[in-house]
Amino acid sequence: MQRHLREAAWCIGTCNGLFLTAGADVQKDRIEVSIWAWGRGLTSWLIEHIVIEGGPKRQASWDELTSLLGRTWPHVHGARLGIAKLAVDTGYQASAVYAWARGAGFAQVAPVKGVEGFNRAAPVAGPSFVDATERGRKVRRGARLWTVAVATFKSETYRYLRLAAPTDEDIAAGATAPPGFIHLPQDAEAEWIKQLVAEQLVTVTTRRGFQKLEWQKLRERNGAGLPGLRARRRLDCRSGSVVRSEVARPRGPARACARPNR
């Protein structure tokens, strides 16, 4: 992982790539959001990881998440990019997620639900229409939901993290990073990197005696008492962002690409 930190001569908050997506994970006391930039061949750049304190029962948390939809980040070539699409996990407080997504607009926001197993042929399915609640009133088929084979995207992320970065000599000769390469900024925290790779793929035996592959967390707690579950959220947020790049990759210029840096 250190090669990623060394190879990137740019800092958190600065864009590269063609467009941005984000993945949001909702928990009891916070909402975590990872913003990624995407280039050709699913090459990606971590732009920023944001922790919104307060959780889904705090309206200010949703307001802060909404504000991210209108925020822009400076591109290395001078323009400014906004989030084209944001995926938000519905595993916790789904009704609150649906209500927020309805208000924010499904054109930019997609509630997602992770499903078990590997489905490489169709890792993303939907959208399906589910009931939602708005101001205490049930809205039939009021929200759109995408189902995601998260294990497939996690495997893809780990495979991309193992790709070798081009050497200085390669770059001088005109070479670029291989398709799928994950660029991490030079000021990314070491703890964040550890949390991105906080799981491993293992073979487990089911109650019926069958074997299957399953992602399991590596780190239960660190010295500061950080639950292993929280460590997994960085990978979940990355997976959500990948989903949005797959589901609704902008055709032509990204939504905010034309905004000049004034």
Question: Which residues make up each language-model segment?
Answer:
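Mg2+-dependent endonuclease catalytic cores in nucleic-acid-processing enzymes, primarily RNase H-like
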Residues: 12-13, 22, 42-208, 238, ...
